Regions:
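Hydrophobic alpha-helix-in-membranes signature
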Residues: 20-23, 247
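Acidic, serine/threonine-rich low-complexity disordered tracts
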Residues: 27-139, 174-274
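Bacterial N-terminal signal peptides
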Residues: 9-21
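Hydrophobic, well-structured mid-protein blocks that either form specific transmembrane helices
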Residues: 129-175
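N-terminal secretory signal peptides that target proteins for export/translocation
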Residues: 1-5
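N-terminal compositionally biased, intrinsically disordered segments and leader/signal-like regions
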Residues: 8-9, 38
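Compositionally biased, low-complexity segments
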Residues: 10, 23-29, 166
């Protein structure tokens, strides 16, 4: 069912990135990591780039003009890593047709944007799955363990990975770390525990858009998988604020016959962060 694409993994995996560099500033001692597709790489962010820490981005989700639910992304930082958590929950009529409750967690090295490990709790229709993935860059392998909470069965698998990968949530903020100059493009590797997907982004232009969070000048970025199991199966457009923050304001995905629209509703900041 196409509604399963509302899951955290299905939602974000169609996004991610392929081949001419966007020319962002790069750390002097951090070489770019090359993926399986020629030109696919993760470029370490400029020291001046900062993740939007201690904030929760809240998005409404629309499916064929129906209010489908809510998605959130929260970023926290400690001394060694950044922790990103994304949630996806259906609501209303869509929830009655196909219920989704997903939680996706990622640990990322903010100096390189290499994802260290991810975990995902998925409740999608009758399915209930727990997945944990550790990325071992020294051995160039990912180690995946998946538990079916309905049947009690466990599946384990290892996969080859390039020297650095991002994941289906952190990839948005990796993109935000780039300069996003009009007409530029890049490819980079994305992995959520299976085979690595190389996704190409192209900066199509800039226009003014209005979302519930406000009205902004925005940079429109097209993203499409160019290798792996999702090649040719979906396209995503993301509108980032046209400023140094590059806040993802709006997302529109086309997956088969389904179209999903995500719009930023609000940014929540804990009282202690004010």
């Amino acid at each position: 069912m196409m509604l399963s694409k509302f899951t955290t993994g299905g939602l974000f995996i169609s996004f991610l990135l392929a081949a001419v560099p966007l020319c962002p500033a790069q750390s002097a001692n951090s070489p770019a990591s090359i993926g399986a597709t020629p030109g696919s790489r993760i470029i370490p962010p400029s020291p001046s780039f900062h993740l939007p820490e201690s904030q929760t981005l809240v998005y409404s989700v629309e499916w064929h003009l129906l209010n489908a639910g809510t998605a959130t992304v929260t970023i926290k930082r400690n001394s060694a890593s950044a922790h990103l958590r994304s949630t996806a929950d259906t609501s209303g009529v869509v929830n009655k047709i196909f219920r989704v409750h997903d939680i996706f967690d990622a640990e990322v090295d903010p100096r390189t944007f290499c994802t260290q490990q991810i975990s995902k709790h998925s409740e999608e229709g009758a399915r209930q799955i727990e997945r944990r993935v550790h990325f071992d860059y020294h051995s160039a392998r990912s180690h995946m363990q998946e538990d079916n909470l309905k049947t009690g069965t466990r599946r384990q698998a290892d996969f080859d990975i390039p020297p650095c990968v991002t994941d289906v949530v952190s990839g948005f903020f990796y993109t935000a770390s780039l300069t996003l100059a009009p007409g530029s493009s890049q490819t980079f590797p994305v992995n959520d525990g299976g085979k690595t997907t190389d996704v190409k982004i192209e900066v199509e232009g800039s226009n003014r858009i209005k979302v519930p969070y406000g009205e902004f000048q925005a940079v429109r970025v097209k993203a499409e998988p160019v290798s792996g199991p999702l090649k040719g199966k979906g396209v995503l457009w993301v509108w980032f604020t046209d400023d140094a923050r590059h806040i993802p304001l709006q997302l529109k995905s086309k997956l088969g016959f389904a179209t999903l629209l995500f719009q930023l509703q609000r940014v929540e900041v804990p009282k202690s962060a004010h």
